[in-house]
């Protein structure tokens, strides 16, 4: 992902304000509610029968935190996203058979959640930088797909 020095600094500053415990679950929960067909990959998560159930589900929150922790790792390795996400790409492709389009959808939900929580600090310029990163991460996660 090609980012200017200003974009990298803005991302680092704003990412320091992010609470992965809270925002990861919210982003994943929104994915599962807005795109209900994505729920089929989460059969073991229990009750996903309503928006309230999804958003309050502790397994959704825990997995969302894992997702954001991985995203945080990606922010530290912007010059090597494919390498950083290689094992996760393999897992999601070969074992879990996740549609790679879901990575793009989740990235969009993450951007929405960041905008909601960061408010005026999430300027159009910051959004543009985050969009580049989530697109890069989605591409890296889809890399092992044939």
Curated annotation (Swiss-Prot):
GO terms under cellular component: blood microparticle; haptoglobin-hemoglobin complex; hemoglobin complex
Keyword Hydrolase among UniProt keywords: no
Expression tissues: Red blood cells.
InterPro entries from the UniProt entry: Globin, Globin-like_sf, Globin/Proto, Hemoglobin_b, Hemoglobin_oxygen_transport
Keywords: Acetylation, Heme, Iron, Metal-binding, Oxygen transport, Phosphoprotein, S-nitrosylation, Transport
Modification type S-nitrosocysteine: residues: 93
Modified residues (N-acetylvaline): 1
Domain Globin: from-to ranges: 2-146
PROSITE patterns in UniProt: GLOBIN
PTM annotation (Phosphoserine): residues: 44
GO biological process, one term: hydrogen peroxide catabolic process
Residues binding heme b: 63, 92
MF term (GO), any: oxygen carrier activity
Gene3D superfamilies referenced in this protein's UniProt entry, alphabetically: Globins
N6-acetyllysine modifications at: 59, 82, 144
Role of this protein: Involved in oxygen transport from the lung to the various peripheral tissues.
Family to which the UniProt record says this protein belongs: Belongs to the globin family.
Protein name (database record): Hemoglobin subunit beta
Organism: Sciurus carolinensis (Eastern gray squirrel)
């Amino acid at each position: 992902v090609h980012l200017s020095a200003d974009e990298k600094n803005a991302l680092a500053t704003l990412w320091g304000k992010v609470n992965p415990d809270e925002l990861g679950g919210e982003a994943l929960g929104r994915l599962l509610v807005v795109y209900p067909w994505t729920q089929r990959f989460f059969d073991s998560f229990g009750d996903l029968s309503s928006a309230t159930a999804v958003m309050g589900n502790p397994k959704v929150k825990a997995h969302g935190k894992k997702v954001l922790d991985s995203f945080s790792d990606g922010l530290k390795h912007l010059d090597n996203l494919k390498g950083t996400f290689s094992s996760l790409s393999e897992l999601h492709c070969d074992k879990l058979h996740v549609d790679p389009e879901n990575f793009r959808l989740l990235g969009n939900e993450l951007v929405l959640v960041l905008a909601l929580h960061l408010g005026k600090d999430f300027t159009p310029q910051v959004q543009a930088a985050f969009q580049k990163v989530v697109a890069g991460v989605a591409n890296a996660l889809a890399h092992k797909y044939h």
